[in-house]
A protein has these predicted regions:
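Short, small-residue-biased leader/transition segments that mark boundaries at the very start
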Residues: 2-3
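Hydrophobic positions on the alpha1 helix immediately C-terminal to the Walker A/P-loop
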Residues: 13-17
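Aromatic/hydrophobic pocket-lining residues that form π-stacking "cages" and hydrophobic walls in ligand
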Residues: 18, 88, 170
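ATP-dependent carboxylate-amine ligase catalytic core
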Residues: 24-117, 133-135, 164
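Acidic, Mg2+-coordinating active-site environments of NTP-dependent enzymes
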Residues: 71, 95-104, 119-203
Length: 203
């Protein structure tokens, strides 16, 4: 089962928090993030632990072999993010993760992570102007691309202060997928303790 997050700002933070919550709840949880900060292996995690170096090397060979086969048959060579996503899927499947938290790379509709046919949750953080040369030059165009992660049977969690211009495509995608949108109420959130690198809240 997959929990997927999209948006312009806050995807990485949301992914990390969600993964930590699911792990603490007892689920074996896979996580992909992009980009990494220090170590490339940060992009692949299970229960907060990065992929082991030897496992990364072995799975990289498998992915490269698959890419060679695709090219030999005249197919289009996958870009780096597509190859990295395939590697993550291989590892998560091999380790039999209960849940997986995926961070999209670019957009959503045509993103490599969108090959997943069913997602439990699609979380959309605040949408802003991002990769305009690919996604479009207006918020509604960008939102339409990002809302492409919404599938039938997926619960949508939407940022509470989403720009009005971005809401139309999100509502349309949810209606077409016959799914509901949950918009959290920030008034239900209480900051218990706030520090530079740590926040504790009650929701």
């Amino acid at each position: 089962d997959v929990y997927k997050r999209q948006g312009t700002n806050g995807k990485g933070s949301l992914a990390a928090m969600t993964s930590s919550i699911l792990t603490a709840a007892g689920y074996k949880t896979g996580l992909t993030i992009s980009p990494y900060v220090v170590d490339f292996r940060e992009r692949f995690q299970i229960d907060g632990e990065m992929i082991p170096p030897r496992t990364l090397a072995n799975l990289t060979e498998k992915v490269l072999d698959a890419i060679d086969a695709i090219e030999a048959e005249g197919g289009e060579k996958p870009v780096e993010f597509e190859a990295v996503t395939a590697l993550a899927f291989l590892w998560f499947a091999r380790e039999k993760c209960d849940l997986v938290v995926l961070e999209t790379g670019l957009g959503g509709r045509c993103d490599a992570t969108n090959v997943v046919p069913h997602k439990l949750v699609a979380a959309i953080t605040k949408i802003g102007y991002d990769h305009m040369e690919v996604l479009g030059d207006t918020l509604d165009k960008i939102a339409a691309e990002k809302a492409g992660i919404i599938k039938e049977g997926t619960v949508v969690v939407n940022y509470p202060d989403q720009p009005a211009e971005a809401m139309g495509p999100i509502l349309t995608a949810a209606a077409e997928a016959h799914t509901s949108i949950i918009t959290p109420d920030k008034d239900d959130l209480t900051l218990l303790r706030g520090k530079r690198l740590e926040n504790r809240i009650d929701y």
